[in-house]
């Protein structure tokens, strides 16, 4: 809700930069002539502004003259805008930003960041601030977020008050000037810049830095909000001077187009006669709509070049500033009424309406009496205040001129009465006017009430709609999660099915390949059987080829077996031409390599056994640590017993004191009885009255002293009893935690023991598998010898067959009548060879099957060995983690005990700092900033280091006070590990101007870096330790 409207003009300031090096070398003239602080003459024409800055003006002078007041206005609840306009290379970015981290050359934006927090530190401590910033640019007429480069085309929308804003822009909560500068650095690194003939760092976009400040008074619940737009506009360009081309030329076109739209808006506002202002022609003017003729206090910098080379552009810029100076803004405080304030306002208006209705009823009654001819006495007429109120709200009522009373009177009296009647009619007319005005006011209030009710109903409807949408989105989110789970399950099932089907396809393809091989062999055998005797030589050649194929198959199997074991693949010969013995020699060599691989597997099994022994040893170490934890628990139990005995002693003292109190009460009663007796006696003895009064006063004073001492002693004992009871409760809780941790460690120990047993069983199983592997190796050796014998037999048969064929060919010419007998013997030999070939094929198949079985067994064995090794590593890691967890728990428990003791002693020392609070919401993945809702937050790693060091030093000091601990020293002799964080912490406090951090609204422990004396550091602790 906006209140306190006031009209103000746009504040226009002109700043000239010095001549640059290129202009000096070119010989350009310095054309501006300055007259006073508010005017400049260019070409004989004066231009007047709110302030004109010559080239020698410093950044600090510019800031104090124009921007300092706008910071106060924003903190008071107004909206503010500062933007720079001008030609390219005229000093706009230098004016707005400058060098961010240079105290002398920093521009308006960093100085405003520091000034905001300086003002906040000096404001009322009941105020709470929320400050968030946004940084975006308008590049090629698209809004681009400089803090999130993935957001490249944001849109402009309007809120419920029809104020434009950029939807989806990143907002960062900040709590110090340094955080604002970090945000500016981050955004500035993402901004578009280019090199032109006039500027080495020419801005190619309009950048807008938005600071949104919300403040709330915690006591009155009054809320104010203010926005500050800090815009650095890109400069207008003349392509013939900048030399822009390509992408830079397109950027220049868009820049000039948006600046032209800005000029059209300012021209329309300056004329004041146009009903339409083209805010929507450009996204820049759309965003700055409230700054130009709206609810905002706006300051415009027009930056100019003093060179005669840029004479035309400078004059155009100055004319632009003069038009902007005539624009009027209506600034108002952005005040948000709370529900309680709305309710009070409603009740106030309701009471006012009720009073007005009562006044109207009285006026109507009085009017009806006047119209009926009655004379209303002065006492019954409305008072002056009521008449004035009625005059504001009454409606106009027609006057009845007919009198219902006819009286016979004299002419003088008649004239007198007519004058009286005319006067009364005049009063009636006045009353009618008052009634008319009051009725109009009532209607206006009724309309306001209806508007408020409609607003309340619409707000409730919007709230319900948002709730429904939220529930709908929640349900959709849950449904989407369920769908994702179902899809993941379906994908897992598909993956499992795919793996199974792939394995089945591989098995079927292998079987198909075996069948094809067997079919080809059978076809070859059939062809050899159907061939004629005269082709026996060709049959011999086929037999050699088949022998070579068998050898190649055997070599392939050996190669695959070697790959599985890990020796690499055997390089097969391209063609086997007769040296079969050499091939067998190669096979034997690779079989010996496989044997060496098997030996390496045995060596790995032995290493696993050694690892098992190491795991046993580590488990024993864990058992010893467990026993140490049990000893610590017993020590804590002994502490609890000693405290219990101390409590019993305190109870006994309390009982004695109560008994003494009772005896003193009895004595008091006796003394009172004696006093009564003395009073009776005093009546008889008047001369002794003065002495008795003095005795009585002395006795009363003595009793009062006894009573006060007794009460003090009782209060002190009660406090000690409460403190000891709290300590006992905390120690009991700690003991329960230690018991739980002990049970957890025992469970982990049992689990590790079970895992060790399982590992032993798996190792035995691996040993059994290794023995089976050795047996398979022996069987393979036997098969190898069998194959060698069969191949040797086949080789011999081939030689005999060749010799026999040669002999028969030689004798064929001499023994033609015996051809039939020779053919018969040849067929017998062919059948014999076929039988031998079948036997050899069976042997080969058996060898292949055995080789395949071994090939299947070996990966399983290797997989189990790898699983065992991984399990051993996992057990070692778990054991190490359990050991580290036990040590961490031990340290944490000790720290918890010391922290509880500290909390008891420093319970009443917390006080709020006398400065305004800057609240920053807490975010996941960051350390929360300090705020009224989280006063123990930290802002940097140095603060965490400082707190940890302070706590550890406090614990060390406590252990020094105890006679059983002498190992810790104070601040480790102020070592380098603790001085650096403390120095950075002290520097942060010095920069902020506070004794404590601006985000910390509590009283911390004394700073150990400021007072190295332990007696000054922890006086409370030392007093308690001494007592």
Swiss-Prot record:
One of its GO terms (cellular component) is neuronal cell body. Residues 353-1027 are annotated as: Interaction with BICD2. Transmembrane segments: none annotated. The keyword Hydrolase applies. Residues 9-327 form the Kinesin motor domain. Keywords: Acetylation, ATP-binding, Coiled coil, Cytoplasm, Cytoskeleton, Hydrolase, Isomerase, Microtubule, Motor protein, Nucleotide-binding, Phosphoprotein. Residues 271-361 are annotated as: Necessary for interaction with ZFYVE27. Residues 907-1027 are annotated as: Globular. ATP binds at residues 86-93. Residues 174-315 are annotated as: Microtubule-binding. It is found in: Cytoplasm, Perinuclear region; Cytoplasm, Cytoskeleton; Perikaryon. Its EC number is 5.6.1.3. One of its GO terms (biological process) is cellular response to ethanol. Composed of three structural domains: a large globular N-terminal domain which is responsible for the motor activity of kinesin (it hydrolyzes ATP and binds microtubule), a central alpha-helical coiled coil domain that mediates the heavy chain dimerization; and a small globular C-terminal domain which interacts with other proteins (such as the kinesin light chains), vesicles and membranous organelles. Belongs to the TRAFAC class myosin-kinesin ATPase superfamily. Kinesin family. Kinesin subfamily. Microtubule-dependent motor required for slow axonal transport of neurofilament proteins (NFH, NFM and NFL). Can induce formation of neurite-like membrane protrusions in non-neuronal cells in a ZFYVE27-dependent manner. The ZFYVE27-KIF5A complex contributes to the vesicular transport of VAPA, VAPB, SURF4, RAB11A, RAB11B and RTN3 proteins in neurons. Required for anterograde axonal transportation of MAPK8IP3/JIP3 which is essential for MAPK8IP3/JIP3 function in axon elongation. Oligomer composed of two heavy chains and two light chains. Interacts with GRIP1. Interacts with FMR1 (via C-terminus); this interaction is increased in a mGluR-dependent manner. Interacts with BORCS5. Interacts with ZFYVE27. Interacts with VAPA, VAPB, SURF4, RAB11A (GDP-bound form), RAB11B (GDP-bound form) and RTN3 in a ZFYVE27-dependent manner. Interacts with BICD2. Interacts with DTNB. This is Kinesin heavy chain isoform 5A. It comes from Rattus norvegicus (Rat). The gene is Kif5a.
């Amino acid at each position: 809700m906006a209140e306190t409207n006031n009209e103000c003009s746009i504040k226009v300031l002109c700043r000239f930069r010095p001549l640059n090096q290129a202009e000096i070398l070119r010989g350009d003239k310095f054309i501006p002539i300055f007259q006073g602080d508010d005017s400049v003459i260019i070409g004989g024409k004066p231009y007047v502004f709110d302030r004109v800055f010559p080239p020698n003006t410093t950044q600090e002078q510019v800031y104090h003259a124009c921007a300092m007041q706008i910071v106060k206005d924003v903190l008071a609840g107004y909206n503010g805008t500062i933007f720079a306009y001008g030609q390219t290379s005229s000093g706009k970015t230098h004016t707005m930003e400058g060098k961010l981290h240079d105290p002398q050359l920093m521009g308006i934006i960093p100085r405003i960041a520091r000034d905001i927090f300086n003002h906040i530190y000096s404001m009322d401590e009941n105020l709470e601030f929320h400050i968030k910033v946004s940084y975006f640019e308008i590049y090629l007429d698209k809004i681009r977020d400089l803090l999130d480069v993935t957001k490249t085309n944001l849109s402009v929308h309007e809120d419920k008050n029809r104020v434009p804003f950029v939807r989806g822009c990143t907002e960062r909560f900040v709590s110090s000037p340094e955080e604002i500068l970090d945000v500016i650095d981050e955004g500035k690194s993402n901004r578009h810049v280019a090199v032109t003939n006039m500027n080495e760092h020419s801005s190619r976009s309009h950048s807008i830095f938005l600071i949104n400040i919300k403040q709330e008074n915690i006591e009155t619940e009054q809320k104010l909000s203010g926005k500050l737009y800090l815009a650095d506009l890109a400069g207008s360009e003349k392509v013939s001077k900048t030399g822009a081309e390509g992408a830079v030329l397109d950027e220049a076109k868009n820049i000039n187009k948006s600046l032209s739209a800005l000029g059209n808006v300012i021209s329309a506002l300056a004329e004041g006669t146009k009903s339409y202002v083209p805010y929507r022609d450009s996204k820049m003017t759309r965003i700055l709509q409230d700054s130009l003729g709206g609810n905002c206090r706006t300051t415009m910098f027009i930056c100019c070049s003093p060179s005669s080379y840029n004479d035309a552009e400078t004059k155009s810029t100055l004319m632009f500033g003069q038009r902007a100076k005539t624009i009027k803004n209506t600034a108002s405080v952005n005040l948000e009424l709370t529900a309680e304030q709305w309710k009070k306002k409603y009740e106030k208006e309701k009471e006012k309406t009720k009073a007005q209705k009562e006044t109207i009823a009285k006026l109507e009654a009085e009017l009806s009496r006047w119209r009926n001819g009655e004379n209303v006495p002065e006492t019954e007429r409305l008072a002056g205040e009521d008449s004035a109120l009625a005059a504001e709200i009454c409606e106009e009522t027609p006057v009845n001129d007919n009198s219902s009373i006819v009286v016979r009177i004299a002419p003088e009296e008649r004239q007198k009465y007519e004058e009286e009647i005319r006067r009364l009619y005049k009063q009636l007319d006045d009353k009618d006017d008052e009634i008319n005005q009051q009725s109009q006011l009532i209607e206006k209030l009724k309309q306001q009430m209806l508007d408020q009710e409609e607003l309340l109903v619409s707000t409730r409807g919007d709230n319900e709609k948002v709730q429904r949408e939220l529930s709908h989105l929640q349900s959709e989110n849950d449904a989407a999660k369920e769908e994702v789970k179902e899809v993941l399950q379906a994908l897992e099932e598909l993956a499992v099915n795919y793996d199974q089907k792939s394995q089945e396809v591989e098995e079927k393809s292998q079987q198909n390949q075996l069948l094809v091989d067997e079919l080809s062999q059978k076809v070859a055998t059939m062809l050899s059987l159907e061939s004629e005797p005269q082709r026996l030589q060709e049959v011999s050649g086929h037999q050699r080829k088949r022998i070579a194929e068998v050898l190649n198959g055997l070599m392939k199997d050996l190669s695959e077996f070697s790959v599985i074991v890990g020796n690499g693949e055997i390089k097969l010969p391209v063609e086997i031409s007769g040296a079969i013995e050499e091939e067998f020699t190669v096979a034997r060599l690779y079989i010996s390599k496989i044997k060496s691989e098997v030996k390496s597997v045995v060596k790995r099994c032995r290493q696993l056994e050694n690892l098992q022994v190491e795991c046993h040893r580590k488990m024993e170490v864990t058992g010893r640590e467990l026993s140490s934890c049990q000893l610590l628990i017993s020590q804590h139990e002994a502490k609890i017993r000693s405290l219990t005995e101390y409590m019993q002693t305190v109870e006994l003292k309390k009982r004695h004191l109560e008994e003494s109190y009772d005896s003193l009460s009895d004595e008091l009663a006796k003394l009172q009885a004696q006093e009564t007796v003395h009073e009776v006696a005093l009546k008889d003895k008047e001369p002794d009255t003065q002495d008795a009064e003095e005795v009585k006063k002395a006795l009363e004073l003595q009793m009062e002293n006894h009573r006060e001492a007794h009460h003090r002693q009782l209060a002190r004992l009660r406090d000690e009893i409460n403190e000891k009871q709290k300590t006992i409760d905390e120690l009991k809780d700690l003991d329960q935690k230690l018991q739980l941790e002990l049970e957890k460690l025992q469970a982990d120990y049992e689990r590790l023991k079970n895992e060790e047993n399982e590992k032993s069983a798996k190792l035995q199983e691996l040993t059994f598998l290794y023995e089976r592997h050795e047996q398979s190796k022996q069987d393979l050796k036997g098969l190898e010898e069998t194959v060698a014998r069969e191949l040797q037999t086949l080789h011999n048969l081939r030689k005999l067959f060749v010799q026999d064929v040669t002999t028969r060919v030689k004798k064929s010419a001499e023994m033609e009548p015996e051809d039939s007998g020779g053919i018969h013997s040849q067929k017998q030999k062919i059948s014999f060879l076929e039988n031998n070939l079948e036997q050899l094929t069976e042997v080969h198949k058996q060898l292949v099957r055995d080789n395949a079985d071994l090939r299947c067994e070996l990966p399983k064995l290797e997989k189990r060995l790898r699983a065992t090794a991984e399990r051993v590593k996992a057990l070692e890691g778990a054991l190490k983690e359990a050991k580290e967890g036990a040590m961490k728990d031990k340290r944490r428990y000790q720290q918890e005990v010391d922290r509880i003791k500290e909390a008891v002693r420093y319970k009443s020392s917390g006080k709020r700092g006398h400065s305004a609070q800057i609240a920053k919401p807490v975010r996941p993945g960051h350390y929360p900033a300090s705020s009224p809702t989280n006063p123990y937050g930290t802002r940097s790693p140095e603060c965490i280091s400082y707190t940890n060091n302070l706590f550890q030093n406090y614990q060390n000091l406590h252990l020094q006070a105890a006679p059983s601990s002498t190992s810790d020293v104070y601040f480790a002799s102020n070592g380098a590990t603790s001085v650096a964080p403390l120095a950075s912490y002290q520097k942060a406090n010095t920069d902020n101007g506070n004794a404590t951090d601006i985000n910390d609204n509590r009283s911390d422990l004394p700073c150990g870096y400021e007072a190295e004396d332990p007696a000054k550091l922890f006086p409370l602790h030392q007093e308690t330790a001494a007592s």
